[in-house]
Amino acid sequence: MWTHPINYDVIVVGAGHAGCEAAFCSAKMGASVLILTSNLDTIAKLSCNPAVGGIGKGHIVREIDALGGIMAEVTDQSGIQFRILNQTKGPAVRAPRAQVDKQMYHIHMKRLLESTPGLHIMQGTVESLLDNENVIQGVTTKEGITYLGKTVILSSGTFMRGLIHIGDLNFPGGRLGDPAATGLSAALKERGFPISRLKTGTPPRLLASSIDFSVAEEQPGDPGVGFVHRDEPFVPPLPQVSCYITHTTQKTKDIIAANISRSALYGGRIEGIGPRYCPSIEDKIVKFADKERHHIFIEPEGIYTQEVYVNGLSTSMPFDVQYNMIRSVHGLENAIITRPAYAIEYDYVHGNVIYPTLESKIVEGLFLCGQINGTTGYEEAAAQGLIAGINAVNKVLKKPAFIPSRQESYIGVMLDDLTTQVLDEPYRMFTGRAEHRLLLRQDNACLRLSHYGRDLGLLSQERYEIFENQKQIIEDEKARLNKTFKKYGNSVVSLAKALCRPEVSYDILRETFPDDVRDLGSTLNASLEMEIKYAGYIDRQKSLIHSLSKSENMVIPEDIDYQSISSLSLEAREKLAKFTPRTIGSASRISGIACADIQVLMVAVKKHAHQ
């Protein structure tokens, strides 16, 4: 075993979406960083759908950009269709989504990492961890190399003891075509990490030239929509394409029903629990038996390939059933499968042994991010990578930890949920997980979080000043519209009051009063409209947050003895000792902790402070 001569500040294990974000931000903050991956040709590979964003997820990508991360930038560079979802619904649930060229996404990310000062990329498979008295020292690889590091970030995705299922066939793999990582799970178990299994899956890929698109509904993109916050209109650098919508048939249902026992999921061969909101097609047929058909979305995988992703047909059926099932779908009667669908089981670590910083409670200096923490999705993984990278560097530099709150970001919501809840399925972000989602809109992420990005050294002063200028423009224009009165309909009202009417949009107001209503650009126009239209709701949510903040942010001492607080219920004592929450707010969100327990805990914390 040879020891590499460099002692890195941060070693990142895995170069998926979590690992790439962790490595980039660590290096950007001035750390010496090594990222290890079993295959340099699969950096930032989009293993499942060729898309970034969506409801809740798109909000997270915007937050990553506001903090100085890179997912938004790489998505904009490689996007081949951009849309805003839920445009007819309220502003809190509107979200950007992009189809991306899978190869271009990998190329742009790899190029960006390679050109980042202080960041070294190395091909190697990590087999074990090095630690001394529960303090991380480095890692060893299958290739016989020891790498020393002050901190280590594990971002192993679905590779830890990954097991692929296609019908009654199963074999080890991190994803189809890539080997599983077997050593890491054993290394974590040896150190007392609680580990369980989760499951996810992916649909077959088809050859576009074999599909009859004439019977499918075309779904084009929206112009001018990107993920990076910018002060000029967004023009995608790649050619833009359409997606298509088709549907299953009665024949599809019959094929699945006749072969349900051959599914790895329903045949009892899978122990891991899959994502509730991304079910397999056999799951949908069984659980929604009364539904005549299910939508299928045909999504291009890139502009230089004929392969398409068939969203909605994830399955663990054997290949012969997949073949017949695909050809029963409207427009896919002659479809050629290029890659089979499969399910995959993998190991994950329980959240009660992880701090909200994503540092483990068992081995100091060891951070975990992405699917190893029980999440599903590229966006959730990237956000965790960003947080893990920031806090790894802060630990090395002996700086305070960075934990965004759930009141100011979806990233904060996720961190709090992962470390206070017992997961019984893969965790996916939705806007409904946030208590104050009207304040956490995708359009105002830069206004909420950019000061953190600047202070951390991830966001340039120039970009920060652009965001601050945008914030000031919105505030100034809001004040001006509140002071400008015009006759509108049968009465004289302020232009802000006129904009509050349901039938009046900012564009309509501009057309009606062109000399009094400024065109700030589509992004700022939309933000200003939301700030004015929903001002009452926004003010109420801000007031609620302010009233709760004193108790929410009350810090619980690390050395508090829950067992000695006799007024706590037995369940509360057990749960608090298990999760060791850092604040009263986090404690209040642990399942099984009653309001009465929180009141008792607050008294105990105050008493502890005076001892």
Swiss-Prot record:
Residues passing through the membrane, by range: none
A single GO molecular function term of this UniProt record: flavin adenine dinucleotide binding
Keyword Phosphoprotein among record annotations: no
Annotated positions binding FAD: G14, A15, G16, H17, A18, G19
GO process annotations (BP): tRNA methylation; tRNA wobble uridine modification
InterPro entries registered for this protein in UniProt: FAD/NAD-bd_sf, GIDA_C_N, MnmG, MnmG-rel, MnmG-rel_CS, MnmG_C, MnmG_C_subdom, MnmG_C_subdom_sf
Record's GO cellular component terms: cytosol
Chief location of this protein within or outside the cell: cytoplasm
Record's keyword terms, sorted: Cytoplasm, FAD, Flavoprotein, NAD, tRNA processing
Subcellular localization, as worded in the UniProt entry: Cytoplasm
Binding site for NAD(+): 274-288
Cofactor entry: FAD
Record's keyword annotation contains Cell membrane: no
Domain of life: Bacteria
One of the Pfam families matching this protein, by short name: GIDA_C_1st
Protein family according to the UniProt entry: Belongs to the MnmG family.
Function description: NAD-binding protein involved in the addition of a carboxymethylaminomethyl (cmnm) group at the wobble position (U34) of certain tRNAs, forming tRNA-cmnm(5)s(2)U34.
PANTHER family with a match to the protein in the record: GLUCOSE INHIBITED DIVISION PROTEIN A, PROTEIN MTO1 HOMOLOG, MITOCHONDRIAL
Subunit relationships: Homodimer. Heterotetramer of two MnmE and two MnmG subunits.
Protein name as annotated: tRNA uridine 5-carboxymethylaminomethyl modification enzyme MnmG
Organism: Chlamydia caviae (strain ATCC VR-813 / DSM 19441 / 03DC25 / GPIC)
